[in-house]
């Protein structure tokens, strides 16, 4: 009887501890969300890369959510449950900071608790017109019918800000259309609008996946370096180039344009579990950065693993900042300590390879 009772108790304890262990394992996996951008934009691909190459190795199940863009992302990061990360354009973030500084209480409530993880890459600003348009340069868009992107998108912020900087006035209400990127291009082709402003990192899936026949009906406007409007736009935006190599079956030459920086943003969390998960995310980001650059969207090749100084009203998230700085320092120390590897040609008896050795794959043996 005693043996039977002890066996039963042992079974109960085993069941209890196995259940507890299983529950502990489940609890260790964090289920977070990141808000990105439109379905065919660059942001959503960057979010997918972070989920695969950074969050997953850190034990975080990161769901990648589409959105209208940066302004909506700020709001969702601030108020939507489960959203722990967001991709945000620098001009949108700065607009919130400026409005808060000017006394807008709602802007202050929204932006003050947000913190940066790190800057990412520059996003090109495309000014798209029909191929038969008489316009050649960006400073010619005054008084034209323009789609500036969806309300809540970073594109809308960039488009309206650039117009105001260049021409000293807002776009007239009757000339503004708030269309998605796809709808804007469709409206452009059927002549319902004159210009579509689109913000996306090159190569943008929106254009690379576009029907080749439709693609031949549109082109990009260029920055005129000598136009007075260009000098005024430089107050906020930076010169950039849309490379023909990004769209080799379409563009015949590079196109000068403007750019805006993308940032990875979080909230000033202080709950122990969340802080711990985001620390692991930071460690994984540093450790797997090479995978992002080699396996992710081409824009990752432009990202530098560094934390530059920030302007007033901008702050890094301290727990992540500490981990990233420590990891960056370790990487730098390792690179300094490692001797420079000889080139393939120098590996053959310390002399350059001959043409014959190269042909026979004898270099580097």
Give names to the regions the model predicted.
Residues 255-365:
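Segments of small-molecule ligand-sensing domains
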């Amino acid at each position: 009887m005693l043996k039977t009772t002890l066996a039963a108790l042992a079974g109960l304890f085993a069941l209890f501890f196995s259940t507890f262990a299983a529950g502990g394992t489940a609890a260790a996996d964090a289920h977070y969300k990141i808000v990105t951008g439109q379905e065919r934009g660059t942001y959503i691909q960057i979010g997918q890369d972070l989920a695969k190459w950074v969050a997953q190795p850190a034990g975080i199940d990161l769901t990648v959510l589409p959105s209208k863009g940066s302004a909506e992302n700020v709001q969702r990061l601030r108020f939507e449950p489960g959203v722990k990360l967001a991709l945000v354009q620098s001009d949108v973030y700065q607009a919130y900071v400026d409005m808060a500084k000017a006394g807008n209480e709602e802007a202050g409530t929204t932006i003050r608790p947000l913190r940066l993880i790190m800057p990412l890459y520059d996003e090109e600003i495309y000014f798209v017109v029909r191929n038969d348009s008489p316009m050649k340069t960006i400073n010619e868009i005054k008084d034209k019918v323009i789609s500036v992107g969806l309300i809540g998108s970073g594109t809308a912020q960039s488009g309206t800000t650039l117009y105001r900087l260049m021409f000293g006035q807002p776009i007239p209400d009757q000339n503004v259309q708030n269309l998605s990127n796809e709808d804007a291009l469709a409206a452009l082709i059927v002549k319902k609008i004159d210009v579509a402003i689109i913000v996306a990192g090159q190569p943008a899936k929106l254009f690379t996946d576009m029907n080749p026949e439709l693609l031949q009906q549109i082109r990009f406007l260029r920055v005129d370096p000598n136009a007075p409007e260009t000098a005024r736009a430089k107050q906020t935006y930076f010169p950039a180039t849309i490379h023909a190599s990004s769209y080799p079956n379409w563009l015949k030459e590079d196109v000068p344009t403007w750019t805006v920086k993308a940032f990875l943003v979080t909230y000033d969390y202080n709950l122990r579990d969340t802080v711990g998960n985001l620390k692991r995310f930071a460690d994984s980001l540093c450790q797997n950065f090479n995978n992002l650059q080699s396996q992710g969207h081409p824009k990752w090749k432009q990202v530098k693993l560094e934390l530059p100084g920030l302007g007033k009203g901008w702050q890094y998230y301290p727990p992540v900042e500490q981990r990233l700085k420590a990891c960056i320092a370790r990487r730098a120390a390792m690179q300094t300590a490692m001797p420079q590897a000889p080139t393939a040609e120098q590996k053959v008896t310390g002399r350059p390879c001959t043409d014959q050795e190269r042909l026979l794959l004898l270099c580097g043996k």
